[in-house]
Structure formats: C-alpha cells, structure tokens
C-alpha cells in the first residue's frame, strides 16, 4: 500500500465523524465572529482525537488552535479550518436547487461547513499516519472565524501563529478536485512612517531631505 493509499484509508475510516461535524456546522449556521457552537463542535472533535486545544488565540472568542506532536524534530504542518455562515445563503440541505430557509438569514450555501470539516479530516488523518509510521511531526489545525467579512487569518498572522509552520494548507469546496494556481491578495495592513530633514529652502536646500521622496 502506498502512502497515499494509507492516508486515504485513514480518511475513510473517520468519514462518519467528518460528515457528522460538517452537518453540525451546517445546522448551526453562525455568522462571522459569532461561530461559538461551530468552533466548540470542531475543537471537541479534535480533542477527542488527542489534540491539545488552545482556546481564544489572539483574543478571538470563536477561534482555537489544536496541536498534536509525534516524536521530536519534525516539521510543523498547519491546516486552516473555517466555519462562518454567510448572509443570504441559507439553503435546505440535500437539495440541488436554491431553496432558502424562510426563517434563516445565514447559511452555508458557499460550503463553509465543509471548510472546517475537511481540515479536521486532513489533520486527523495526518496525525494517525504519523502515529502508525513513527513519522516525527507536529500537526496543527486552526479553528479560524470570519473567512469572509472579517479575516480571522489576519489575527493569526499578526499574532505569530504561522511563524513556526513549515507548510500551511487551506481549501475551499468547488466543482473540481484540484490545486488552485490562483494568487490571493493579502489584507494585512502595514503602517510606514517616512521622516525627512528640515532645511532653509533659500539658503541651504541641499541640506534638506523630503519624506515624500521616500514615500513616492
């Protein structure tokens, strides 16, 4: 059995847990920064798999970091799992056409219930593979709020949570199973301060330095 076949078998072995988690998040349908039940469901599922849980990283109430280490000296692999529902995208489950729920404002019509569940499946499968094979590594799964209209990943980046990662994986459901070749725009803000040097414009203009020159 190849490594890929082994990992596929490990994913299939936990498929019922993955589906159950996805359905829970679907039914919770919580908007960005208010995904309390979704975050708890995902962190509880990872805790049951032996992951240590850090709650509220960077002060985000609906975020967590789940970590599992096998051996010593291995790489750090991070999976980003998100679970925010979106406004105007409620949907009756199991229906191929758009059937919004009359009493629901938010929903997972964009498949964000799968974002967290899929990352859960990947993190657990890699953890199980490391345990079975003795592969040294650390697996982390970030429970990340506000995939849209908020940017939970920005807070993780600003807090240094990606600094020790050797690889970071995120995904989004779509019409095909592929690796995206598209680039993504960052939304991290950076503040620069440019300082000049004052001088008399008539007598000693050569002694001055314009901060605008650097800014331009």
State where each predicted segment sits.
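Metal-dependent amide/peptide-bond hydrolase catalytic core
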Residues: 1, 48, 212, 216
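Acidic/His- and Gly-rich active-site-bordering loop/insert found
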Residues: 3-108, 113, 117-120, 124-137
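Histidine/acidic-residue-rich, glycine-tolerant segments that coordinate divalent metal ions
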Residues: 86-88, 96-107, 113-114, 129-216
């Amino acid at each position: 059995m190849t490594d890929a076949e082994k990992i596929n078998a490990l994913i299939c072995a936990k498929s019922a847990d993955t589906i159950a988690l996805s359905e829970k998040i679907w039914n919770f349908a919580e908007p960005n920064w208010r995904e309390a039940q979704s975050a708890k469901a995902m962190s509880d599922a990872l805790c049951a798999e032996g992951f240590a849980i850090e709650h509220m990283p960077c002060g985000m109430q609906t975020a967590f970091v789940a970590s599992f280490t096998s051996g010593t000296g291995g790489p750090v692999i991070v999976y980003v799992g998100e679970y925010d529902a979106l406004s105007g995208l409620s949907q009756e489950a199991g229906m191929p056409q758009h059937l919004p729920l009359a009493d629901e404002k938010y929903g997972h019509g964009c498949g964000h219930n799968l974002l967290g569940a899929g990352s859960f499946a990947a993190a657990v499968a890699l953890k199980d593979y490391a345990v079975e094979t003795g592969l040294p590594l650390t697996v982390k799964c970030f429970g990340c709020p506000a995939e849209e209209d908020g940017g939970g990943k920005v807070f993780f980046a600003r807090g240094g949570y990606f600094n020790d990662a050797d690889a970071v994986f995120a995904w989004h459901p779509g019409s095909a199973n592929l690796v995206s070749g598209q680039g993504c725009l960052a939304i991290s803000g950076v503040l620069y301060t440019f300082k000049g040097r004052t001088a008399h414009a008539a007598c000693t203009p050569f002694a001055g330095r314009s901060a605008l020159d650097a800014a331009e």
